[in-house]
Regions:
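Short aromatic-glycine-(Arg/Gly/Cys) micro-motifs in beta-strand/loop hairpins
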Residues: 33-68
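Compositionally biased, intrinsically disordered low-complexity regions
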Residues: 11, 45-46, 106
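Negatively charged, low-complexity tracts enriched in Asp/Glu with abundant Ser/Thr
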Residues: 1-28
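Surface-exposed polar/charged interaction patches
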Residues: 11-12, 31, 90, 94
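Short, compact, well-ordered microdomains
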Residues: 64-107
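Aromatic side chains
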Residues: 13, 38-39, 103
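Short charge-dense sequence patches
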Residues: 1-3, 29-39, 76
Length: 107
């Protein structure tokens, strides 16, 4: 059964190692164990903007309920860190600022 609690961006940023993000989304929603998949999320913390979490953390009900919107998917932590850098760079190049939340709302 697909859990609708997890919120996903319509067009998430994808790391180079991601081939079929919709399949990954389905597996994450089902609670499958995907040890190499990392997710970039908006942060719930007021002093942070983006966070990187391993997808397997969403197998726990509490984490599924409290997970902020997922805006990126990567294969491996290093790729996830590069993806965050790419997001910040894109926002800055297109706006001249780093208002990442506002930019992602309009994307």
């Amino acid at each position: 059964m697909v859990n609708r609690v997890i919120r996903w961006a319509r067009n998430p940023y994808l790391g180079e190692g991601i081939e079929d993000w919709k399949e990954i989304r389905t597996k994450v929603n089902k609670g499958d164990f995907l040890p190499t998949i990392f997710l970039v999320t908006l942060s719930n913390h007021p002093d942070h903007v983006l966070e990187i979490i391993p997808s397997f953390m969403l197998r726990q009900r509490w984490n599924r309920k409290t997970c902020p919107k997922i805006v990126g998917i990567a294969k491996g932590k290093k790729e996830a860190m590069n993806l965050v850098a790419d997001i910040v760079r894109e926002v800055y190049e297109n706006t001249g600022a780093v208002e990442i939340r506002e930019y992602l709302k309009k994307r």
